[in-house]
Amino acid sequence: MARARSALELDLDPDVTIGLGLPMEHDDVNGFFPGTSTTLSQTGSNIRNLLLTNRGERVGQPTFGADLLLTLFEPMSDELIIRVEEKISESMADWMPHVTVNKLVVEPDESEINQMNIELEFSLTMNPEVHDAITLSFLTGT
């Protein structure tokens, strides 16, 4: 019987696809379903999926999600930014315990008054010296 390979071993094999990447965009190589070949890149897609999902949207997992989209019609304020940071931190702790959030920045956009930018830098607990980051932007209410 073949021995199961660790996540780090799979990360070193460029021929192994670990999961689906987000966003799903059509290209000539992958079609609509781009694959990810490292645990770190798959985790970035999983974080994006978590943050863009409202609780109750996922069948069988009613608490999955961060409810960030529910803040879209609220006016930009310091309280809103704090609430978004809390929602992200809580969701990450609940659903991604294998991820360490190294930096979380939620701030209004400098040029668009109703846009909120989110930058989340993360690493995996199995390999904490390797980092990646995702960014999201939301237009909020006026």
Regions found by a protein language model. Give the residues of each.
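Short secondary-structure junctions
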Residues: A93-V101
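Immediate N-terminus of the mature polypeptide
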Residues: M1-E86, E90, N102, E107-T142
